[in-house]
Design a protein with these regions (language model features):
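N-terminal beta1-alpha1 cap of cysteine-dependent amidohydrolase-like domains
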Residues: 1-83
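Short alpha-helical
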Residues: 14-15, 95, 113
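Gly/Ala-rich beta-loop-alpha elbow adjacent to hydrolase catalytic centers
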Residues: 89, 93, 98
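A conserved active-site-flanking secondary-structure segment within enzyme catalytic domains
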Residues: 99-113
Length: 113
């Protein structure tokens, strides 16, 4: 049986999987990149994937009115949690996951480096 792909969810064009993509390529591990910021929908069924990696972006987790795809991304991540699909959140992706899990996320007093 073929291995299910790892899914990367891109929230902005310039935030891609970079070295993670190279890691997977070198090991012949299948992966898929979804440009959800460009209105590419999130998948319906998270069980199609071996793991999900929501990536970064400059937006805030609560800016769903300005970035409607965030709402769909949160719903999809909640389904991943329900189905025990491994999730690795990067930057904004970790904040989205934290929100889905019920944690409080807020703006830090200091900028990131």
């Amino acid at each position: 049986m073929a291995m299910k792909p790892v899914l990367f969810l891109k929230n902005i064009s310039l935030e891609g999987p970079e070295t993670m993509e190279l890691f997977l390529q070198k090991r012949n591990i299948p992966y898929e990149i979804r440009d959800i910021y460009a209105e590419v929908p999130v998948p319906r069924d998270p069980r199609e994937f071996s793991a999900v990696v929501p990536l970064g972006g400059p937006m805030n987790v609560e800016e769903e009115e300005r970035y409607p795809f965030l709402r769909d991304e949160k719903r999809f991540l909640a389904k991943c949690v329900e189905e025990d699909i491994p999730i690795l959140g990067i930057c904004l992706g970790s904040q989205l996951l934290a929100t889905v899990l019920g944690a409080r996320v807020w703006k830090n007093a200091w900028s990131e480096i």
